[in-house]
């Protein structure tokens, strides 16, 4: 097997959705970005929401002096999809997007109380919150929750490729129907690697079949390959009292 883990391939997963969205929107470029401030920050868009209730996001006690998760922690199995346990669903029942309207009442991720703990549980919660926040972002164009997750500098720069797409989505100009971001951990526990940890995983960035716009037009989303599980691993490094996470995948062009 000649496949190797590729940082650029991982960034390709992040940018694939934006590229597909903008390609699908090419015929729609005459549509103006809403009557409001759609060109402003997505956090001030109609899809933006106030932060989650404070009682749900009280910071846990952390031990930044510790360089690794406590050895006394039970060897719990975290194998499987990294799922966030709590969402704010007070807006009502979630409705996927259709040709007539964007997704409605999108559940808002609630930051786990143990997310900043220097433990395997803390790393798991960070990964789960990252997946949920990224899905919320590509659904609503609002990255307020995604900004609560620390990622490496290269990945943060790669996120800038989503800016134009986010403006379209947040302004109600165009939208995906029901995007899904899924990170599945394929081992029970992470493995120590240098100053951090690696966790074998698969990643799915499924942006769905269609992009719709406010003028009633529908354009198919080109396949990116990212809608199928991509093998790789999550990197986690505890720094500054939080977990910094990074996605690593095999090159999309490689056979695995």
Language-model features, listed with the residues they occupy:
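Secretory targeting signals
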Residues: 1-5, 15-20
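N-terminal export leaders
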Residues: 7-11
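Exposed beta-sheet edge and beta->alpha loop/turn motif
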Residues: 17, 32-49, 53-58, 62, ...
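Juxtamembrane and targeting peptides
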Residues: 26-122
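Core segments of small alpha/beta cavity-forming domains
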Residues: 96-174
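A short, amphipathic edge element
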Residues: 170-189
């Amino acid at each position: 097997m000649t496949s190797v883990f590729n940082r650029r391939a991982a960034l390709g997963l992040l940018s694939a959705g934006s590229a597909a969205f903008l390609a699908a929107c090419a015929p729609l470029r005459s549509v103006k970005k809403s009557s409001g401030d759609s060109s402003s920050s997505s956090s001030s868009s109609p899809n933006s929401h106030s932060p989650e209730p404070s009682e749900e996001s009280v910071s846990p006690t952390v031990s930044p002096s510790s360089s690794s998760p406590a050895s006394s922690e039970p060897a719990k199995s975290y194998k499987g999809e990294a799922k966030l346990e709590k969402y704010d669903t007070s807006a009502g029942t979630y409705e996927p997007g259709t040709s007539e309207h964007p997704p409605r009442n999108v559940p808002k991720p609630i930051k786990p109380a143990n997310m900043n703990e220097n433990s395997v549980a803390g790393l798991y919660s960070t990964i789960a919150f990252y997946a949920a926040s990224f899905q919320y972002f590509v659904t609503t164009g609002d990255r307020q929750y995604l900004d609560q997750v620390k990622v490496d500098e290269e990945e943060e720069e790669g996120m800038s490729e989503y800016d134009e797409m986010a403006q379209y989505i947040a302004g109600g100009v165009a939208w995906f129907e029901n995007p899904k971001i899924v990170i599945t951990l394929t081992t029970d526990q992470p493995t120590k690697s240098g100053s951090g940890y690696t966790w074998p995983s698969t990643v799915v960035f499924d942006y769905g079949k269609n992009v719709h716009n406010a003028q009633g037009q529908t354009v198919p989303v080109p396949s990116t390959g990212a809608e199928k599980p991509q093998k790789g691993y999550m990197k986690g490094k505890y720094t500054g009292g939080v977990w910094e996470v990074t996605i690593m995948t095999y090159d999309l062009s490689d056979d695995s």
